[in-house]
């Protein structure tokens, strides 16, 4: 912002605190404000948000809307899935692309899909940009898989645990992910 070489700038941080993601990209706006104020006044500047403002101004976990169709046999074994996810990214991309990609990569969770199509839309909105958050899209994708399993069990009046076991990845077959990676490690 000021065109200064990196070695001429000193930034002191009392402590970073817990959390994940928001400190990766979303601290830049506050650093810019502090830098401009320091350049204007010639004095060191401290910028500390109170918790309410911090919660309003910084990104959160991407919320997802998902729709899916599944085909399965009478025992609850999945034959194919078609999953469409949409996430609220906020007013800028931030880390939305990799978060959404990871949600798609985790939409199988621990289950084999013989036929699969997974799509994801990144929705730009007039809200604060969502960002990296623990799980980084994984929980959103895995939740879709669990919704599918629960729906099959409910529809067929089966024990959800039995439906889960029936659809787990296999050791010698049924072990290829939707993105063509062979599952080799089993517990």
Indicate residue ranges for each PLM-predicted region:
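Structural alpha/beta core scaffold segments of enzyme domains
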Residues: 1-187
């Amino acid at each position: 912002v000021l065109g200064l070489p990196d070695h001429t700038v000193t930034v002191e941080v009392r402590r970073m605190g817990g959390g994940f993601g928001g400190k990766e990209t979303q601290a830049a706006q506050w650093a810019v404000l502090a830098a401009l104020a320091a350049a204007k006044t010639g004095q060191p500047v401290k910028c500390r948000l109170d918790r309410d403002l911090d919660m309003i101004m910084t990104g959160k976990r991407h919320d997802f809307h998902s729709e899916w169709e599944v085909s399965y046999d009478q025992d609850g074994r999945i034959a194919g899935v078609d999953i469409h996810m949409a996430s609220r990214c906020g007013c800028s991309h931030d880390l939305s692309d990799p978060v959404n990609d990871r949600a798609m990569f985790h939409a199988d969770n621990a289950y084999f899909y013989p036929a699969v199509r997974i799509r994801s839309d990144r929705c730009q909105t007039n809200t604060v940009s969502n960002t990296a958050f623990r799980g980084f899209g994984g929980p959103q994708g895995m939740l879709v898989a669990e919704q599918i399993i629960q729906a099959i069990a409910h529809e067929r009046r089966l024990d959800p645990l039995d439906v889960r076991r029936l659809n787990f990845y296999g050791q010698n077959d049924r072990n290829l992910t939707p993105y063509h990676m062979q599952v080799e490690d089993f517990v």
